[in-house]
Amino acid sequence: MDTTVYRNRLTRMGVLSLLALAVGLATSSSPQAQSVSVKQTTESVRRALERLPYYGVFDFLAFSVDRGTVTLHGYAYRGSLQTDAEAAVKRVSGVDEVANKIEVLPASTNDDRIRWATFYNIYTDDFLSRYAPGGPMAARYEARQFARFPGMQPFGTYPIHIIVKNGRTTLMGVVDNESDKTMAGFKARDVGLVFGVDNDLIVKK
């Protein structure tokens, strides 16, 4: 994955502000060069995506702004998120056009198994459970109650997003330190029958 693009990823979580709006602004080479209107549009788009009600831990959204054009990137567990994100951004003042490049992940029973097993491994771990919004007990409850239903996922402010496609896992989001990043990768690789794990987590600075 291109490092520049990934560092412009948008994550919906409590630590989002710590990314300092690291959203790609193709019209300028530095924050100082950004116009006020572009900054305002960027903030408004970010808020619009944050408010999507069905954006969960198995999704990941990002965007870039070039004048009045917003390009959406990322992965959607359900196709409805792709269309909902585009509709929400189109309503933002200052947005003239939306290029929707969000990829809808293919339906797969095996991928679902990997998603939930990875979720359980990470968010109930003694070391990483502080990232679970409701703590490890809430994560255990969600895994036990909803994993059996196709298309279900935990919604909310989960900092570590779990993207699974064709048996391969990619971790995206923001963590506090390198130790947490390493541990999350280890927990993802510990899931049975996963073909590989890409650890693209960003360490908070």
Task: Label each PLM-derived region with a short phrase.
Residues D2-L19, L25-K205:
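N-terminal targeting leaders
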